[in-house]
Design a protein with these regions (language model features):
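Charged low-complexity interaction tracts in eukaryotic proteins
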Residues: 1-7, 36-80, 230-247, 255
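Positively charged, polyanion-binding regions of nucleic-acid-associated proteins
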Residues: 1-24, 183-211
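A short acidic, leucine-rich amphipathic alpha-helix
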Residues: 25-31, 202-204, 221
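Short, basic interhelical loop/turn and adjoining N-cap
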Residues: 31-40, 209-216, 355-357
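Extended boundary segments
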Residues: 64-126
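Short, basic/aromatic beta-hairpin or loop at an interaction surface
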Residues: 123-143
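Short, Lys/Arg- and Gly-enriched loop/turn segments at beta-strand edges
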Residues: 166-177
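Extended alpha-helical scaffolding segments
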Residues: 314-365
């Protein structure tokens, strides 16, 4: 226990005093501090669960409490948020509410509760507060104690700021936000036209570059992005018009190729079949449990006809021919069928849909 405490103290001190630092620099300073096994500390650091340390876009590490001290991030309050005392965190507040993942920042400076909640994950708490899932932003929300926003005098459309002070996180009602003079331009410089950046990391990098950034309230990050022709999806930042779907598809195919030692074409075929399996799973979830699989299949075929997607089914038939390779057939099962019966049922539905479109060898596989 004492050794773990010493490592925590060492990481906090090293990054607070000398960050941002590369992992090699951290390891060297840990050794100088008397930590016997720097590699073990670095492994714990990479998990991002024990300490409020995070990486910049260049992979250097920073101590967030030091980097964000005195900075304020704003969010324009939505109607549901005003009613239910919560603030959507993505993208406006992500850079600072990351701190809420750590116990000491799970409450505001005044002692009131503040925690990140997700629809479908924090169901019991949301039900207790009478908050419907659809009111929660997909990226999550910072849930405040009832009456917090009313006490602040904040209503729908108002700007609310979250600032890190020496006492912890505090909420501020923002009257008029100042003009952004550098952050938007710096974020535009940080994004790669071919690869999105992790959004909070880009903002933290901008904070390292400009010690004055966000020390006074400016417009919400969402609005700053719009002003500079940038776009975001979930936690990712990219130039306007970036094709996130194609990027995710390529990444997933590369992962499958690496995981199973596949050539690129086989990885594309496998991932396309996995995505079709996901579609079948969603279709089954939305279907009456008493409906027979063949009825579900008929519904899927009817939907394909109504939406003009016969060409897609034909294309997937071509890809399904890859199942003539026993290895790909085995990998499809491994990637889609879990411990529940839903995965197997969806796979059966997928097989039945593809059967008329694929060669006999693939049907046998």
């Amino acid at each position: 226990m004492a050794e773990a405490f010493d490592a925590t103290q060492a990481v906090a001190r090293i990054l607070a005093e000398h960050g941002p630092l590369s992992e090699d620099d951290i390891a060297r300073r840990l050794l100088d501090s008397g930590v016997a096994d720097p590699d073990a500390v670095l492994r714990a650091l990479r998990l991002e669960t024990e300490w409020p340390a995070r990486q910049l876009v260049d992979d250097r590490w920073v101590w967030l409490p030091t980097l964000l001290a005195g900075r304020v991030f704003t969010h324009r309050l939505g109607a549901d948020e005003a009613v239910h005392d919560m603030l959507g965190v993505t993208p406006d507040l992500d850079p600072i509410t990351t701190l809420c993942e750590h116990e000491e920042y799970g409450r505001l400076a005044d002692g009131s509760a503040a925690r990140i909640v997700l629809a479908g994950y924090d169901e019991e708490l949301l039900e207790r507060r009478g908050i419907p899932d659809e009111a929660i932003d997909p990226g999550g929300a910072l849930l405040l104690e009832p009456g917090t926003l009313a006490t602040l005098g904040a209503a729908a459309g108002d700007l609310v700021g979250v600032r890190l002070t020496a006492a912890g996180l505090v909420l501020e009602r923002i009257g008029t936000a100042g003009a952004d003079t550098s952050v938007g331009a710096r974020l535009a410089e940080l994004v790669d036209p071919d690869e999105p950046a992790f959004f909070p990391a880009a903002v933290w990098t901008a904070c390292v570059d400009d010690p004055a950034a966000f020390t006074e309230p400016v417009a919400p990050l969402r609005e700053i992005l719009d002003q500079h022709g940038l776009t975001h999806e979930d936690d990712w930042l990219a130039p306007g018009g970036f094709n996130f779907d194609a990027w995710r598809f390529e990444n997933r195919c590369e992962l499958l190729a690496f995981r199973h030692d596949l050539d690129p074409n086989d990885a594309v075929a496998l991932y396309t079949l996995i995505k079709l399996h996901e579609t079948m799973s969603l279709l089954l979830e939305a279907t009456d449990p008493d409906e027979l699989p063949r009825d579900v299949l008929a519904t899927a075929a009817e939907t394909a006809t109504e939406t003009g997607s016969d060409s897609l089914v034909d294309l997937l038939g071509d890809i399904g021919a890859a199942l003539a390779d026993p290895l790909l057939a085995e990998l499809l099962v491994a990637e889609t069928v879990g411990t529940d019966s839903g995965g197997a049922a969806a796979l059966g539905l997928l097989t039945e849909m593809l059967e008329p479109k694929v060669p006999r060898a693939a049907r046998v596989a």
